[in-house]
């Protein structure tokens, strides 16, 4: 099936690429794709194209990669060129998903139907940069995807559609990301079909209550504070997989802890102390309960199941991870 609604797409990572793929496969014309400039990545730090750019180029779509869209910003010449291109490209709506650049008012007002954002949370909860991580970290039972009509604020626009997704007890940011990317892709296609058919989408202002912000994830957040309850640390490990992981310092070496669950602990063990080692994992005392770590990684090594890790790097009951503030 082909459609007449012309969609400019702006996005960068895999989450956005899933939406672009769904829009393209549904038959909507995409006359232009905006994505971030190529960035150094990987161990060799070679320039790599974004997931959105790779998908678009493989299908012959026009791609632009301005470092900014602000005329008065750090890259005025590049911004002006990109804005001229947007003005010269006939389109009806812009879909934005994890693009990574601020859209000035000029861009928000350019499409006939405005700019629709795909946000990976149930707004107004978890506005901001890291909604998937923060939902898991906080212990939310569910999250979802919200389509909103973009305005000048940070994820403050009126809500158009939403899809709810349960957070499974073993979900990591990686697995939940994929569920939400698929949900967002379906949601935006349904919305575009409705927009083409009816000419407008019903918009509901976000409620004033329940607003929270999902701050960007920092590498420093990997450090596990063993004084916390084991359940909170297990959520932290899941929330920070694949980045930045959970981390603990043992005898001066920083170990990455990639998979863990909360188990009953011992009252006589200081937080951070290894209280049991077995084929099922390494059990570490916490402020409340204990954390059973089932996947570990030593510096320069690979992620390994506990059994394989211990075969090459034995640990002992009684060893103690350094406090987070001393690591």
UniProtKB/Swiss-Prot annotation:
PROSITE patterns: GART
Matching Gene3D superfamilies: Formyl transferase, C-terminal domain, Formyl transferase, N-terminal domain
Residues reported in the UniProt entry to bind (6S)-5,6,7,8-tetrahydrofolate: 121-124
Annotated coiled-coil segments of the chain: none
Record field: catalytic activity: L-methionyl-tRNA(fMet) + (6R)-10-formyltetrahydrofolate = N-formyl-L-methionyl-tRNA(fMet) + (6S)-5,6,7,8-tetrahydrofolate + H(+)
InterPro entries associated with the record: Fmt, Formyl_trans_C, Formyl_trans_C_sf, Formyl_transf_N, Formyl_transf_N_sf, Formyl_transferase-like_C_sf, GART_AS, Met-tRNA-FMT_C
GO CC, alphabetical: cytosol
Gene Ontology molecular function, alphabetical: methionyl-tRNA formyltransferase activity
E.C. code: 2.1.2.9
Keywords: Protein biosynthesis, Transferase
Family according to the record: Belongs to the Fmt family.
Chain's role: Attaches a formyl group to the free amino group of methionyl-tRNA(fMet). The formyl group appears to play a dual role in the initiator identity of N-formylmethionyl-tRNA by promoting its recognition by IF2 and preventing the misappropriation of this tRNA by the elongation apparatus.
HAMAP family: Formyl_trans
Protein name (Swiss-Prot/TrEMBL): Methionyl-tRNA formyltransferase
Gene for this chain: fmt
